[in-house]
Amino acid sequence: MTIRLHAFTLDCADAAVLGEFWARALGRELDPGAGREFASIGLQDPGRPAPCWMFARVPEGKSAKNRMHPDLMAADLEAEVERLVGLGATWQADLKLGGMRWSTLLDPEGNEFDVIADAA
């Protein structure tokens, strides 16, 4: 049996708003029909780059640090962090471990994600 990643799904208060942030952050388009209850990126495109992203409205708010989060890679870490903050992210910390550098940010609903400096 082969398993593959289909989607990242984020619980949220407003799926369209959070979906639009992530679409802009990833340089992708929000799928047609996005609304407050559900939105997606790449779900309706069979030729999409995997994985797709889904956003589902839930009644409860975020109450703790994410146990899993996306790590994005950027050629220019500082410029990408500045761009994401301009889209609505909140910078949390700049970190370094071994030869790897990254910044931790929060999306508009407080979900953690990292932007890693591409060492290539």
PLM regions and their residue ranges:
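Core segments of cupin and vicinal oxygen chelate
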Residues: T2, T9-C52, E80-E82, G86, ...
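Short, solvent-exposed beta-strand edge segments and adjacent coil->beta transition regions
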Residues: L5-A7, K65-H69
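Vicinal oxygen chelate
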Residues: A15, P70-E109
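A short acidic/small-residue loop/turn micro-motif
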Residues: G33, A119-A120
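Short beta-strand micro-motifs in enzyme catalytic cores
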Residues: E37-A39, N66-M68, R101-S103
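Active-site beta-strand termini and strand-to-loop segments that position acidic
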Residues: I41-P46, L105-P108, D118
